[in-house]
């Protein structure tokens, strides 16, 4: 692995940079199980809250709108948290979604000196036979010389409810399909696009959204699924030309090969305003 690329993923991006709240992440150990525990200490998944006995008000459902780790820590500090290692009741945690667990996980890894990045794609372990919208994070394992996927959302309760048979600290490639891989699988006719999505949204539009989210996340700009910055994020695939499909096919190929040719990938994304997240969207709120 290119040492410059690992250094890139070791450094914070705008969504994980921590400024005024550094005391809340002081002395994070370079130990993935502990980092995941810290993530679970501070976040409660919006769509699992009932399983933990927490009923959400409309106001609490707005908490995932805070994108950046700094903003999340500020929110938690106001709720009485002093450090991410503190264990509190589920009701005292901040409400988030899978993206938040993954972005915070990547941020804490970087604080611990571990290269990491959030990934958007689809999980096969939520609904049998379907590829459901999801996020994980990857960290670089020096000993194994490879990226290892982690699902920081899957605590003991969720593992039991979902009958998870794999280690959430080492998610397999068949368990989580990244956005670019999913797109190319469907374009090659190796998977049914209508099996990819969540809730009432399925098909190529959702595949495109998660590819765009993953590509920008690999440039350390992990957006929320509902963020709409125009370009291909807003244009339904039913309205695409052959040229549009060719562009996104190429994006998928370059994103899948990000480690082999980061320069080609980053140049392609940053050179296409219909793909790249605009600067005004990028803020650690």
Label the predicted regions:
Residues 2-15, 36-45, 52-59, 122-135, ...:
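His-Asp-centered catalytic microenvironments across diverse enzyme cores
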Residues 2-92:
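Secondary-structure boundary elements
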